[in-house]
């Protein structure tokens, strides 16, 4: 066999093989590569969007958390103010109640003192009558004597 003819035949066979591959094998491979390339590009775009969404969500969460902490601090501050107001009101009520009890006790003490004074006056009057009876050795009218003692006690 002639080497030129063999080379020519192999070149022709190779050309037919290349044409066959270009017509039947190459289009599905390029289509699959294009589809895969498109899918990878979409995946990268989705990953980029997901990162942006994640960053936005993290910013939103941190903003919401900050607002929530501020609201909690305000609520705690209001609760403390309210508690202090209740404590002050209770103290004021306790002061008023204490003053009322002290005033009542003072009034009661004053009544007892007046009652004791009246009892002492009547006892002094009785002693004065008894002393006067002994001095005069006669009985003095108790009504007249009580009037004299009342005048004397009112002057004291």
From Swiss-Prot:
Main location: membrane
GO MF, one example: proton-transporting ATPase activity, rotational mechanism
Subcellular locations according to the entry: Cell inner membrane
Gene Ontology terms: cellular component: plasma membrane; proton-transporting ATP synthase complex
Topology within the bilayer: Single-pass membrane protein
Superkingdom of origin: Bacteria
CDD domains in UniProt: ATP-synt_Fo_b
InterPro entries per UniProt: ATP_synth_B-like_membr_sf, ATP_synth_b/b'su_bac/chlpt, ATP_synth_F0_bsu_bac, ATP_synthase_B_chain
Annotated family: Belongs to the ATPase B chain family.
Complex formation: F-type ATPases have 2 components, F(1) - the catalytic core - and F(0) - the membrane proton channel. F(1) has five subunits: alpha(3), beta(3), gamma(1), delta(1), epsilon(1). F(0) has three main subunits: a(1), b(2) and c(10-14). The alpha and beta chains form an alternating ring which encloses part of the gamma chain. F(1) is attached to F(0) by a central stalk formed by the gamma and epsilon chains, while a peripheral stalk is formed by the delta and b chains.
Protein name: ATP synthase subunit b
Species of provenance: Stutzerimonas stutzeri (strain A1501) (Pseudomonas stutzeri)
Gene: atpF
